[in-house]
């Protein structure tokens, strides 16, 4: 029995060749089909050069297991989520490696209603079946079919339902950097909707054409070197906002009108405010790493903040429990109740653009006030031999004088004027530190250095 190392905690990712190839993709399709026994599922793929061949091998495996396959073609992950819940099919698989290096590919798997399939919700079972590779003979009489379809119109209809075009009362200039990934065709369709409604929004498109050679680098705007082209275009065109996507556009990253990159933490607050203007009293889910800005905005706007452990499975589950309208992580993952609790990289920028018009404000001024009120360190990673021992040591140092302690995810320790969260990574031998203060950048910086010194 071969061990398939491409199966990770939440998805499938591997180096092309030994770790992931067409034979393995076929086996994954067979395993998904044998385990879940779906009648019909959707598949799609990103722009990577191997995505089409891997997707077709995957589809062959699904069909040999008796599953009918609907292929939506070039797509971002959220288009698979949408197609799965909108069409009412039994599951979906997107072939994507998002922002991984060129020589990688992968898959993201969901079941009915676009519910995620990860380690403890079926991924280990699919892995076991794919590794054993002992599938029953193919029955030609019950072999599935393959059909190409498009859900682009219905998907963009859904996106446009989050905003009211009548609110776009002033001209907006938006730089959109698709990173030669999968986002371009969606932006083109959204642009048509704005134009048809006579809405004065101009799109300046950077690295717009899908190109699996990634001539401008792998699209991962979390890396500072991947931000320059977006920032330059914002400056050159004097744009109101810059928007940059990763390869499968399940995350979007925003730049203000002065071309400054906005940390994901402050975007959560903006989106919470946007939703609470539409639905006062709604519940908003946030993660424990940085919280004060989000809690402040939610309570000021009449909403209810609810904290969840970090990670998409935890946030989606908590959103369902609480019937929360929106959940946000500082890592640029944003989840929406009406999007089957899935994350979307398209909904956030639409809501922020609408908010700019509603508040008749620049993005710089909206965010600068929040950054001044709650300055944050951003996430700092440190490799440690014994992470648990380090966290215990930090806790012993800071707990006695603390105003509040929370262990939802690692440890969060609060004092009246500053707080921090220290947690281990689910995937690497590192600890992750986040520090924030109340309107005191010097204090936040000093405490960050103090804790980092103790971690050595």
UniProtKB/Swiss-Prot annotation:
One of its GO terms (molecular function) is magnesium ion binding. The keyword NADP does not apply. GO terms for biological process: GDP-mannose biosynthetic process; O antigen biosynthetic process. Transmembrane segments: none annotated. InterPro entries: A-D-PHexomutase_a/b/a-I, A-D-PHexomutase_a/b/a-I/II/III, A-D-PHexomutase_a/b/a-II, A-D-PHexomutase_a/b/a-III, A-D-PHexomutase_C, A-D-PHexomutase_C_sf, A-D-PHexomutase_CS, Alpha-D-phosphohexomutase_SF. Pathway: Nucleotide-sugar biosynthesis; GDP-alpha-D-mannose biosynthesis; alpha-D-mannose 1-phosphate from D-fructose 6-phosphate: step 2/2; Bacterial outer membrane biogenesis; LPS O-antigen biosynthesis. Binds 1 Mg(2+) ion per subunit. Its EC number is 5.4.2.8. CDD domains: PMM_PGM. Keywords: Isomerase, Lipopolysaccharide biosynthesis, Magnesium, Metal-binding, Phosphoprotein. It is an enzyme of class 5 (isomerase). Pfam families: PGM_PMM_I, PGM_PMM_II, PGM_PMM_III, PGM_PMM_IV. There are two duplicated genes for manB and manC in this E.coli strain. Involved in GDP-mannose biosynthesis which serves as the activated sugar nucleotide precursor for mannose residues in cell surface polysaccharides. This enzyme participates in synthesis of the LPS O9 antigen. Belongs to the phosphohexose mutase family. This is Phosphomannomutase.
């Amino acid at each position: 029995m071969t061990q398939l190392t491409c199966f990770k905690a939440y998805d499938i990712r591997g180096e092309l060749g030994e770790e992931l190839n067409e034979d393995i993709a076929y086996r994954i399709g067979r395993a998904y089909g044998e385990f879940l026994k779906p009648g019909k599922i959707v598949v799609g793929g990103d722009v990577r050069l191997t995505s089409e061949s891997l997707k077709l091998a995957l589809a062959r495996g699904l069909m040999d297991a008796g599953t009918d396959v609907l292929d939506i073609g070039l797509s971002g992950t959220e288009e698979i989520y949408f197609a799965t819940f909108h069409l009412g099919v039994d599951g979906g698989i997107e072939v994507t490696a998002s922002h991984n290096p060129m020589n990688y590919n992968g898959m993201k798997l969901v079941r009915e209603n676009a519910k995620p399939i990860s380690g403890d919700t079926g991924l280990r079972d699919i892995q076991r079946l794919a590794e054993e590779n002992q599938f029953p003979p193919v029955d030609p009489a019950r072999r599935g079919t393959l059909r190409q379809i498009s859900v682009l119109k219905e998907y963009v209809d859904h996106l446009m339902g989050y905003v009211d075009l009548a609110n776009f009362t002033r001209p907006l200039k938006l730089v959109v950097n698709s990173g030669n990934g999968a986002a371009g065709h969606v932006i083109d369709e959204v642009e048509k909707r704005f134009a048809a409604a006579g809405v004065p929004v101009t799109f300046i498109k950077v690295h717009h054409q899908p190109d699996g050679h990634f001539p401008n680098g792998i699209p991962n705007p979390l890396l500072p070197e991947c931000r320059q082209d977006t920032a330059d275009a914002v400056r050159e065109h004097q744009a109101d906002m810059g928007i940059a996507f990763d390869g499968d556009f399940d995350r979007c990253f925003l730049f203000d009108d002065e071309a400054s990159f906005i940390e994901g933490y402050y975007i959560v607050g903006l989106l919470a405010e946007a939703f609470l203007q539409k639905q006062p009293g709604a519940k908003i889910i946030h993660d424990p790493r940085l919280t004060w800005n989000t809690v402040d905005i939610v309570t000021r706007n009449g909403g209810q903040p609810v904290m969840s452990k970090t990670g998409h499975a935890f946030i989606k589950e908590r959103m369902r429990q609480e019937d929360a309208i929106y959940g946000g992580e500082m890592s640029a993952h944003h989840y929406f109740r009406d999007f089957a609790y899935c994350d979307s990289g398209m909904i956030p920028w639409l809501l922020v653009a609408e908010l700019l018009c509603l508040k008749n404000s620049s993005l710089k001024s909206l965010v600068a006030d929040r950054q001044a009120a709650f300055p944050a360190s951003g996430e700092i990673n440190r490799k440690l031999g014994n992470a648990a021992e380090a966290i215990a040591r930090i806790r012993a140092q800071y707990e006695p004088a603390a105003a509040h302690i929370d262990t939802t995810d690692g440890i969060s320790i609060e004092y009246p004027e500053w707080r921090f969260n220290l947690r281990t990574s689910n995937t690497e031998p590192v600890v992750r530190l986040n520090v924030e203060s109340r309107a005191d950048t010097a204090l936040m910086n000093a405490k960050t250095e103090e804790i980092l010194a103790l971690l050595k």
